[in-house]
UniProtKB/Swiss-Prot annotation:
The chain crosses the membrane at residues 509-529, 549-569, 598-618, 623-643, 658-678, 766-786, 1183-1203, 1205-1225, 1255-1275, 1292-1312, 1319-1339, 1445-1465. Glycans are attached at residue 1405. Residues 1-21 have a biased composition (Basic and acidic residues). This is ATP-dependent permease PDR12. ATP 1 binds at residues 878-885. Residues 144-397, 836-1084 form the ABC transporter domain. ATP 2 binds at residues 972-979. It comes from Saccharomyces cerevisiae (strain ATCC 204508 / S288c) (Baker's yeast). Induction: By weak acids like sorbate through the WAR1 transcription activator. Belongs to the ABC transporter superfamily. ABCG family. PDR (TC 3.A.1.205) subfamily.
């Protein structure tokens, strides 16, 4: 038992001894319990009262938490003999009560273990592949026929391999199995195979036995008893911890419960019990959160995942790398929580953990070791080390067992373990030799006997009967016997609905933004169409505007549902995980969305309708108004489920958005407004039958115009010469007009204009109801087939022509030795001692850092001092929140807020101007451009960060040296990629270090948590490289969180902090940590064991461990210690002796950037071009969007005729083309955001290049690709529509649309992104601005009909006004009008006159022509001669085309300027209200930039030139 366990148990004992009252209450309750058992308790629950007795008082909760910590340290074997005194604590009574009452009442727990033999998993051999690029995209397209042929002939050319093979083992109920293996060893595949999650594999072979049942039967009938828990925590971030756990428990509440508890009692009691055990009770009301939503901590989120999994009441749990990203303290708490669960409810746990400390390893009962997919050990955990020691390997002192077992699986040439003398030729060297040794060992034979014994002890029929009973007792009444789900379908829907309302409540910000967007847009639309007509009399002048407003409102209500695609993909990982847990049908989640989303959408539609109906003076009838609401609400629901259906059908968000954009275009074009039904081509007209907007638009328009009599606004003929003419000889110039009638019937108008009829209104609503339910059914059915996101190991992506030879088991080359490192960094034949003696020394003293916090201030660092000498590695340690990273950032001058005071000196002098350029900083997050190769990333850093005087060839030579030193030769041409498809964690960390090394940091190298997330061997490799780097003369300051003993002893010096940024120790570590341990053993009175990790020991001493507690203030102990006095004296001595040493203050290093501006442009432009070229998904999505949408528009308007309607169609088609730009801008935001994040996180802080270079280069390359896309748009739109082929027309359209318009929308899109905090915000701003520009450009509402304010301001400001004018004119210029029959104005001349005589005066003053001048009745007058006259009423003129061209250049220049200025103001400058109001400072001095970190921002305090403050 460890010292921690002893302290916990002593603490429990001492508490019970001094608390007789509580012990008496326990005894009284136990006595009463014996009486209560004999009474009828059908109406009450003994367990409920028993738990309430424990959990209702603070002492009970504290004892339960303490005892849970003791149990979490016990293995299954130790638990069998573990006894708890009833007077000490009543958890024993609780545990015994739970199990005994289950058995007494005939409740079958359903426990099960697992055994497997010769398990082999076959998968696709994907250890390396060619990296993505546009070239590879075309290669894949060209290879499609070959793939189809291979599928047809059933000859697959996909290489296969055994991911794991010949694995055998037994895990009994209540046992924990520790899976050891490096990344790529097959640990994840091993866990998935045992859990039945094998959909990603080609084949699974071997024997499985779940207490006798084979895997097929277990997965088909009892899937809920076996759970695979992925390494990532997928939860709905906006709901609370209590709501998350309650939902899981409700879905798994059994029908038969102990003591006939109600469902609510069961949920409340079990939740309180587990959350008390796992320390989550204080988080009940806190949101779960995620990486982007603030909530509980990462460790608490892991425990939420554990409680949720325990709520499943399963028998076998597989935890895949569950502690990745957690510090060692949190990882220990997590492992202890799993141990507690197995001991309390007798389930089994199979766990894979990286960098497991000895205290974690000791919790496990059994261990298996995997080496390149081969099993090389399975057996008791406490015998694993001995097995490999007998093999011949030597385990160093203080190396943890897990670290030793992992080290054994390293390739022989990189293996650092010693071999026993005489065993050099006996030990296995490769994975196949290890496997052969294992299969021939006595331990393997013992395992086979254990397997056979397990099989004999668990007859199949007995297990089947037992699990059948357990399952029947769990299934809710009415649930199918063979169902995998505990509660029935409608109960699932009900619980999902409750959670849905909780999600809506938790995400109130989204709801507010959603409703606000409807309110703002409604106000804009309402004011834009204000007083279409006078309330007392409608006129034909407002008819078009009335239809345009209805169409725009309908379009807005529908297109907002496009956000359903993003929402669907954000929630998919969570609901797919729940499906794998057998919690509920995915269709139940789909159904609940109908109910939970409806209130918000209903309120939004009501807001929209109230404003857009009454302000524009629509029909003043209550019935018409409520029909207006009904039609809009129905079509919104229908389109919402259309986009949900698109998301369900798609595998990725990129594909879904591309298809969704095409759907939007179809909905717009075939709604009946921009392309009337009568003008649709017969071969494509069927689209309007499946378009819900068609039915909704007809219902809206027909209801609005029904029984409306519109006074004619323009009679033909009229004007001079026709003053006294009779109405019998005139006709209204409006669709549906009847000669001789001053009024136009609304029903007649919509019939001739749109081919609509009022009698279809309610039929259309019924059709949309059918469509809505149809899409609901499609979505519900398809959602049941959603599959989890495909996973897999790290896949290296190589540039074509640089793929390494197949068959290598490891892609890493040997890391350089100390001698090679010294020669590469300092040159050959150098005197290392002299080099170190001449290097600068960095010191800091009396360092404080204070930040504003909640209206007050908080001190994060308090009186910190220390130094870093050349050739030494200094570790910076402390518990989470102690201020390690904060101190590192302060020393590296990467802080831009708060106040810093103290001394930071180089050679006892103020920091030189070259300080920033002389230091390197390796951040914890490995941020690199995914599309670059390792060599290209290093060359890019070298070109821009080394001095400009260094020749390019010399920079590249140095890059090759760094590649060799880091052992990256084998993957130097591999792309960085994303996690899982690209470099693994270790390779990324090496690249991060390499990027800083190629900059040649002559003074200091800062590293923040360089071993975080690595397995033990990878962490050892990184620290060994750092050690070699330090031995060559480099100064290193590194934060590290609870390293293993072997890693810890590589450091020379330690600076230890406690919470509040207070120092606890600074000094040498000493050989075998003797110097450090001597101090802490003296202060604490506790000895550090020989096998104990010194790093964990000192953290437990100061109270930083998972269960440690202290009574002394270690900061005060340190200040009073002689070690502190000696350390301060050392700092003072350095300050006294170092001033005579010269400081390297090269003037070239004093500049902020090493490279010139033009060099920065050249390098960044080249890198950006590579980024685009190697992003085929983005390029493919752009081209698909452009080609598909433009072709759709072109074919919809194919062969536009010479009629009046043809001119309007040309006008409307431009409206459709503008919508394509909206989709491209949204795609642009997502892609450009990654580059912005990379720059701001890493490159800006390291002064790699100026921020404006990023903006201009990205705009240039984005414009190039967008221009190619626009060219395809032109081809697919212009020629199918058969517009004018004259060079002056087609050439101008091409010039403007292909060459000028992309410049506009690219610079506009980047401007919006670069001033926005994130992509969703950018998309929201863009959609509102874009919609406003479309609304005010004159298409939906002609300029003359706009209110004066909008007409004078927004019409002239909207850039789309000039885009539309410029693009429409070449389509209609000089195109003769040939009116269709329904477009003629037909009237009768006065008696005795011909049509020509009657209309001659009118035609002299107006445009148009007369078809039958000699006729004496039914004069057919076409009001236009050429289509220019048709569009002239929209203020579109051919003579304005070059003016519009000039205006667009003005807008482009404005966008570029706005992009630069807004980025500078929003993301570069550090603003405060005081500085903004200080106008004098605006003109007299430069301000500090957010990304700038040069030392002139430090201001000296009068009287002390070395004292610095920073605000």
């Amino acid at each position: 038992m460890s010292s921690t366990d002893e302290h916990i148990e002593k603490d429990i004992s001492s508490r019970s001894n001094h608390d007789d009252d509580y012990a008496n209450s326990v005894q009284s309750y136990a006595a009463s319990e014996g009486q209560v058992d004999n009474e009828d308790l059908a109406a009450t629950s003994q367990l409920s009262r028993h738990l309430s007795n424990i959990l209702s008082n603070e002492e009970g909760i504290e004892r339960l938490e303490s005892m849970a910590r003791v149990i979490s340290h016990k293995t299954k074997k130790e638990m069998d003999s573990f006894e708890i005194n009833d007077l000490d604590f009543d958890l024993r009574s609780l545990l015994h009560y739970l199990r005994s009452r289950q058995l007494e009442q005939g409740i079958e727990p359903g426990d099960s273990g697992i055994a497997f033999k010769n398990l082999t998993a076959v998968g696709v051999d994907a250890s390396a592949a060619y990296g993505p690029s546009v070239e590879e995209m075309f290669r894949n397209i060209a290879s499609i026929p070959a793939h189809l042929i291979s599928k047809f002939t059933k000859k697959s050319d996909v290489p296969l391999r055994n991911i794991i093979q010949n694995c055998t083992g037994v895990v009994e109920s209540g046992e924990m199995l520790f899976v050891v293996g490096r990344p790529g060893a097959g640990c994840s595949t091993f866990l998935k195979c045992l859990s039945g999650e094998t959909s990603e594999l080609v084949d699974v072979q071997g024997e499985f036995s779940y207490d006798g049942l084979d895997q097929s039967e277990m997965m088909s009938k009892y899937k809920g008893y076996v759970i695979y828990c992925p390494e990532l925590d997928f939860h709905f971030p906006k709901i609370t911890v209590k709501e998350t756990i309650d939902f899981a428990l409700k879905c798994k509440t059994p029908r038969v419960r102990i003591d006939k508890m109600t469902r609510k009692q069961y949920v409340d009691n079990i939740r309180d019990m587990w959350c008390t055990v796992f320390g989550l009770r204080h988080t009940y009301a806190t949101k779960v959160g995620n990486d982007f939503v603030r909530g509980v901590s990462g460790g608490e989120r892991k425990r939420v995942s554990l409680v949720e999994a325990q709520a499943m009441n399963a028998s076998i749990y597989s935890w895949d790398n569950a502690t990745r990203g957690l510090d060692a303290s949190t990882a220990l708490e997590f492992a202890q929580a799993i141990r507690t669960a197995t001991n309390m409810v007798n389930n089994s746990a199979i766990v894979a953990i990286y960098q497991a400390g000895e205290n974690i390893y000791e919790l496990f009962d059994k261990t298996t070791v995997l080496y390149n997919g081969r099993q090389i050990y399975f057996g008791p955990a406490d015998k694993a080390v001995g097995y490999f020691q007998r093999m011949g390997w030597v385990k160093p002192n203080r190396m943890t067992s897990a670290e030793f077992l992992t080290s054994v699986t390293v390739d022989f040439e990189n293996r650092t373990l010693d071999i026993k003398p005489g065993y050099e030729d006996k030990v296995p060297k490769s994975s196949s030799e290890f496997e052969e040794y294992w299969l021939n060992s006595e331990d393997y034979q013992e395992l086979l006997r254990t397997y056979d014994d397990y099989q004999s002890r668990h007859p199949v029929n007995e297990t089947r009967d037992r699990l059948d009973v357990a399952k029947k007792q769990r299934l809710q009444q009415g649930q199918r016997e063979n169902s995998q789900y505990v509660v029935n379908y409608w109960t699932q829907v009900y619980y999902c609905m409750i959670r849905g309302f909780q999600r809506v409540k938790g995400d109130s910000t989204y709801t507010k933004v959603y409703l606000s967007s409807f309110l703002i847009k409604a106000l804009i639309i309402g004011s834009m169409f204000h007083k279409i007509d006078d309330k007392s009399q409608s006129t034909t002048a407002g008819a078009y505007s009335r239809g345009g407003m209805l169409f725009y409102v309908l379009l807005f209500a529908s297109v907002t549902s496009l956000a359903e695609i993003g929402n669907s993909f954000s929630s998919r990982p969570v609901i797919v995980k729940h499906k794998s847990y057998s919690m509920y049908h995915l269709s139940a989640e789909s159904l609940q969305e109908i109910i939970t989303e409806f209130p918000t959408k209903f309120v939004a539609i009501v807001i929209l309708c109230l404003i857009t109906y009454w302000i524009p003076f629509m029909k003043y009838e209550a019935g018409a108004f409520f029909q207006y609401i009904l039609y809009l609400l129905t079509v919104q629901q229908c389109t919402s489920f259309i986009f949900k259906f698109v998301a369900t059908m798609s595998k990725s968000g990129v594909d879904a958005h591309a298809v969704g954009g095409l759907w939007v275009l179809m909905l717009c074009v075939y709604a009946g407004f921009v392309l009337p039904i009568g003008e649709m081509h017969h071969w494509i007209r069927w689209l309007h039958f499946i378009n819900p907007l068609t039915y909704a638009f007809e219902s809206l328009v027909s209801t609005e115009f029904h029984h409306r009599e519109m006074l004619c606004s323009a009679l033909v003929p009229s004007g001079p010469g026709y003053e006294g003419i009779s109405i019998a000889n005139q006709v209204c110039d409006a669709a549906g007009a009847v000669k001789g009638n001053l009024y136009v019937s609304g029903d007649s108008y919509i019939l001739h204009q749109y081919h609509f009829a009022y009698k279809h209104a309610w039929r259309n609503w019924g059709v949309n109801i059918v469509w809505t339910f149809g899409y609901i059914v499609f979505n519900v059915i398809l959602s049941e087939y959603l599959k989890p996101v495909e996973g897999g190991g790290d896949l290296l992506l190589y540039k074509r022509g640089h793929m390494p030879e197949l068959g290598t088991e490891n892609a890493d080359a040997r890391t350089a030795s100390r001698e090679e490192m010294m020669e590469a960094l300092n040159g050959p034949n150098v005197d290392l001692e002299k080099v170190i003696a001449e290097k600068d020394v960095f010191t800091w003293n009396h360092l404080d850092y204070t930040i504003p916090y909640d209206g007050a201030t908080r001190k994060l660092l308090s009186d910190v001092f220390g130094y870093v000498k050349p050739g030494k590695m200094t570790a910076l340690m402390g518990e989470s929140g102690a201020g390690k990273t904060t101190l590192l950032n302060v020393l590296a001058q990467r802080i831009n807020m708060g106040v810093i005071t103290g001394d930071m000196l180089v050679n006892a002098k103020p920091l030189p101007a070259s300080f920033n350029r002389s230091c390197g900083y390796v951040a914890q997050a490995d941020n690199h451009m995914a599309e670059l190769s390792v060599r290209e990333s290093l060359r890019f850093a070298a070109e821009l960060r080394q001095q400009s005087s260094v020749p390019l060839e010399e920079k590249y030579e140095y890059v090759e040296k760094i590649i060799t030193l880091l052992g990256m030769q084998n993957y130097a041409e591999a792309l960085v990629g994303k996690t899982g498809r690209g470099l693994n964690v270790e390779q990324r960390k090496k690249l991060s270090i390499g990027v800083e090394l190629v900059a040649k940091p002559s003074l200091l190298l800062f590293l923040d948590e360089p071993t975080s997330g690595l397995d033990s061997q990878s962490a050892w490799s990184i620290v060994q490289f750092m050690r070699a780097l330090a031995d060559s003369g480099q100064s290193i300051l590194c934060t590290i969180h609870q390293p293993s003993a072997t890693l810890f002893e590589q450091f020379d010096r330690l600076l230890l902090l406690k919470k509040g940024g207070k120092m606890v120790y600074f000094g040498d570590i000493g050989p075998n940590s003797e110097t450090l341990l001597k101090y802490f053993e003296r202060q604490s009175g506790m000895k550090c064991g020989v096998s104990e990790n010194p790093a964990e020991y000192i953290l437990n001493c100061i109270g930083a461990g998972a269960t440690a507690s202290v009574n002394s203030d270690w900061h005060d102990l340190w200040l009073a210690s002689p070690e502190c006095a000696a350390a301060r004296a050392e700092v003072e001595e350095l300050h006294r002796t170092l001033p005579g040493r010269a400081v390297n203050d090269d003037p070239e290093l004093a500049t902020r950037f090493a490279a010139s501006y033009m060099t920065q442009i050249k390098c960044v432009l080249r890198r950006t071009a590579l980024q685009f070229w190697r992003s085929p998904v983005y390029i493919r999505a752009k081209f698909f969007e452009c080609v598909a949408c433009a072709l759709f528009v072109g074919l919809s308007y194919v062969g536009v005729n010479h009629s009046v309607g043809g001119a309007i169609e040309a006008f409307s088609s431009i409206f459709m083309l503008l919508l394509i730009a909206l989709a491209m801008i949204n795609q642009l935001h997502v892609f450009a955001y990654d580059s912005r994040e990379l720059y701001e996180v890493r490159e800006a802080a390291s002064n790699t290049f100026h921020w404006s270079v990023l903006l201009l280069c990205h705009a240039a390359v984005e414009n190039f690709w967008s221009t190619l896309c626009q060219f395809m748009c032109f081809i697919c739109y212009y020629w199918p529509a058969q517009f004018s082929g004259r060079a002056s027309h087609a050439g101008f359209f091409f010039f403007f649309y292909v060459l000028i318009f992309p410049l506009y929308f690219v610079t506009y899109g980047l401007w919006i992104l670069y001033m926005s905090p994130d992509v969703p915000s950018a998309s929201m701003i863009n959609s509102n601005l874009f919609a406003a520009m479309l609304l005010f450009c004159g298409i939906l509402q002609p300029r003359e009909k706009m209110p004066a304010f909008w007409r004078r301001l927004m019409y002239n400001v909207s850039p789309f006004t000039y885009v539309v004018q410029a693009l429409v004119t070449p389509l209609v210029h000089n195109k003769k009008v040939v009116c269709n029959p329904h477009e003629y104005n037909i009237m009768d001349p006065p008696s005795g006159k011909t049509c020509g005589e009657f209309l001659s005066t009118y035609m002299d003053n107006n445009t148009g022509y007369l078809v039958n001048p000699t006729a004496t009745e039914n004069c057919q007058y076409c009001p236009y001669t050429v289509q220019d006259q048709v569009v002239a009423k929209y203020n579109v003129k051919w003579d304005h085309r070059w003016r519009n061209f000039g205006f667009m250049w003005a807008y482009i220049c404005f966008n570029i300027a706005a992009m630069l200025i807004c980025y500078y103001v929003v993301r570069v400058k550090v603003w405060s209200l005081k500085s903004v109001l200080n106008f004098k400072k605006w003109f007299n001095g430069p301000r500090k930039e957010r990304h700038e970190k040069d030392t002139n921002i430090f201001q000296t305090v009068p009287g002390d030139e070395n004292k610095i403050t920073k605000k």
